């Protein structure tokens, strides 16, 4: 089937979902925020090797706008900002884990990553 015949070309829920979480950094940001529970901007940036301040700030604004993370400002000097996952974000994580499992099973052996053991 060519992409012109695809029934997903108009108002596709999957396309909408990918517009919310697509891009190079959004899934990594969501996973980092969710794993931390609550995290400050600089701590989050430290977990994302290679991301610029501009890209991180933009992605965080989009994720907040789309209801996937909460932003809390604290009136202190210097100003403090924390990010936390929303309930929608928490519901998304098992789906991302399934997608990761699917992708890992399809990856060539030299590109496959080993899942990190969670501390007990």
Q: How does the language model describe each region?
A:
Residues 1-4:
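Long, low-complexity, charged/polar intrinsically disordered regions in eukaryotic proteins
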Residues 8-55, 76, 82, 113:
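N-terminal helix-turn-helix DNA-binding core of bacterial DNA-binding proteins
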Residues 56, 60-63:
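Basic amphipathic alpha-helical segments that dock to polyanions
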Residues 64-73:
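A short, conserved structural fragment
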Residues 66, 95-107:
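Alpha-helical linker/hinge and terminal dimerization helices associated
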Residues 75-99:
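Basic, amphipathic "hinge/linker" alpha-helix immediately C-terminal to the N-terminal HTH DNA-binding motif
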Residues 113-120:
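Exposed, interaction-prone assembly regions rather than primary DNA-binding/catalytic cores
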């Amino acid at each position: 089937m060519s992409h012109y015949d695809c029934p997903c070309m108009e108002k596709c829920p999957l396309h909408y979902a990918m517009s919310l979480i697509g891009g190079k950094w959004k899934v990594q940001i969501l996973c980092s925020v969710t794993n931390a529970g609550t995290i400050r901007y600089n701590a989050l940036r430290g977990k994302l090797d290679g991301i610029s301040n501009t890209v991180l700030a933009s992605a965080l604004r989009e994720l907040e706008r789309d209801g996937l993370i909460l932003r809390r400002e604290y009136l202190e000097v210097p100003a403090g900002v924390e990010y936390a996952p929303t309930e929608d974000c928490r519901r998304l994580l098992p789906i991302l884990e399934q997608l990761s499992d699917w992708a890992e099973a399809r990856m060539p052996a030299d590109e496959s990553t080993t899942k990190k053991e969670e501390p007990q």
